[in-house]
A protein has these predicted regions:
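Periplasmic OmpA-like peptidoglycan-binding domain that tethers envelope proteins to the cell wall
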Residues: 146-215
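Solvent-exposed, polar/charged alpha-helical surfaces in well-ordered, non-transmembrane soluble domains
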Residues: 43, 47, 119-130, 140, ...
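Secondary-structure end/capping motifs
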Residues: 1-55
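Second-shell loop/turn segments in exported
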Residues: 30-38, 109-118, 149-156
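Structural recognition of the beta-strand scaffold that forms the well-ordered cores
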Residues: 109, 116, 139-141, 184-186, ...
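Periplasmic peptidoglycan-binding/tethering modules of Gram-negative envelope proteins
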Residues: 57-139, 176
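Sec-exported extracytoplasmic/periplasmic mature domains
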Residues: 50-54, 130-137, 168-176, 214
Length: 215
């Protein structure tokens, strides 16, 4: 069932789906290059509920305590090579997003003047990864931005390298969830500031990666 929300976006509200063994192996992260999507969804929305209703849901069981893949692994072992391929979204080389579903700025910390992540970036990258895994059927556009410090052309190149670094990190972490064609990158350099560049705070806001998800 698909309904339109207050923003005019179409939202899937349910329906049923039958998964075969290969599909379950994929969503429980048992296939090479995949991650446990069930665990990510459970934890993400568990944290949301706990934050919204702290008195009703002060805590919830850890995912590892409620998700047991022993039976699934046993069935897969018995099936051997007689397992079909999982049903996964396909993305064409033309990765242009024609319908934007979500747009968000992420402050991913890089080494100054480089496209290398700082240790502080890890938590943000993990959160971004989880969000994109949950929305696994959507295309992703990674937009790199800088402040106005330094040479204009060098900033354009730097924003491209940083956007590519995010793309490469996601694809290496889970090739199955980020196949070729899902992620596209665009470099903007200092051309699209969201805050004045006259202050350190403004510059910090402009050094960002914008993630767009859509169809």
């Amino acid at each position: 069932v698909i309904e339109t929300d207050k923003q005019g976006l179409k939202v899937e509200l349910g329906g049923s789906r039958a998964n075969n063994l290969a599909d379950n192996m994929e969503i429980f992260g048992l296939n090479p290059g995949s991650v446990n999507i069930v665990k990510i969804v459970y934890t993400t929305f568990g944290d949301i509920v706990k934050k919204l209703y702290p008195q009703l849901v002060p805590t919830y069981p850890a995912a590892d305590d409620v998700i047991n893949t022993t039976f699934l692994e046993a069935v897969a072992k018995r099936a051997g090579s007689n397992i079909a391929s999982p049903d996964k979204p396909e993305f064409s080389p033309d990765n242009t997003i024609r319908e934007t579903i979500s747009k968000k700025n992420w402050s991913i910390a890089f080494e100054s003047g480089k496209s290398t992540f700082t240790p502080a970036a890890q938590q943000t990258l993990d959160q971004l990864f989880n969000d994109l895994v949950i929305a696994g059927n959507l295309k992703v556009e990674v937009n790199g931005h800088t402040d106005n410090a330094g040479d204009f052309n060098e900033n354009m190149k730097l924003s491209e390298r940083r956007a590519f670094a995010v793309k490469e990190w996601l694809e290496k972490k889970s090739p199955s969830n980020f196949p070729e064609g899902r992620i596209n990158i665009t470099a903007h350099g200092s051309t699209k500031p969201i805050a004045p560049n006259e202050t350190p705070e403004g510059k910090a806001k402009n050094r960002r990666v914008e993630i767009v998800m859509g169809k």
